[in-house]
Design a protein with these regions (language model features):
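Short, well-structured N-terminal submotif of metal-dependent ribonuclease cores
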Residues: 1-41, 50-68, 143-148
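Short secondary-structure boundary/capping segments
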Residues: 2, 26-28, 68-69, 77, ...
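Acidic, PIN/NYN-like endoribonuclease modules and their adjacent C-terminal/linker elements
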Residues: 3, 109-111, 115-149
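Generic structural signal for small/hydrophobic residues in well-ordered secondary structure
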Residues: 7-8, 45, 66, 88, ...
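Alpha-helix capping/helix-boundary segments
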Residues: 10, 41, 84, 110, ...
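Residues that scaffold the ATP/ADP-binding catalytic core of kinase and kinase-like folds
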Residues: 13-14, 26, 48, 87-91, ...
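Active-site neighborhoods of divalent-metal-dependent phosphate/nucleic-acid chemistry enzymes
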Residues: 47-52, 71, 75-120
């Protein structure tokens, strides 16, 4: 695999004041150039900021975190290409056919991004993308030794 596409829940957890030990250990062990974000995760993070009322004490802190993420991952923030959009359509349609439920757009877009870039999708929401065909790694539960780069 070519690296790790980090889901928003992973980004939020490692950016917090006290990330869980297992997650922090895994994250720190990864080569920086193997860690990637999707522009969709940045949008989700921004959405979370916008949920906070204007003047909320945490707004500024989260805005600063988002800026640090954009700077840290510069050159490793993946956009949504035509190939990713088409892959998402295939995944979304197949998952709905199999499960009779519409999957989360963002989660399946991240799965499509990981597939198109040959990456693992690092997420806590493994069940949400179980039928996507993506190689999914849950850093809270899975053994990293089973997911070689």
């Amino acid at each position: 695999m070519n690296g790790w596409l980090l889901d928003t829940n992973v980004i939020s957890a490692v950016s917090g004041p006290k990330p869980e030990a297992r997650l922090a250990t895994w994250f720190k062990a990864q080569p920086e150039d193997a860690l990637f974000l999707s522009v969709l995760s940045l949008a989700e993070y921004w959405k979370g900021i916008e949920h906070l009322p204007p003047g909320h004490s945490m707004r500024s802190k989260h805005q600063q975190t988002l800026l640090r993420l954009e700077n840290r991952f510069q050159g490793r923030i993946l956009s949504v290409s035509n190939a990713i959009a088409l892959r998402w359509g295939m995944i979304s349609g197949e998952v709905k056919r199999i499960t009779h439920h519409s999957p989360s757009v963002i989660d399946t877009m991240l799965a499509a991004t990981a597939i198109e870039h040959g990456m693992y999708l690092a997420t806590r929401n493994a069940t949400d993308v179980a039928h996507s065909g993506a190689a999914v790694f849950n850093p809270w539960k899975d053994d990293p030794a089973n997911f070689p780069l």
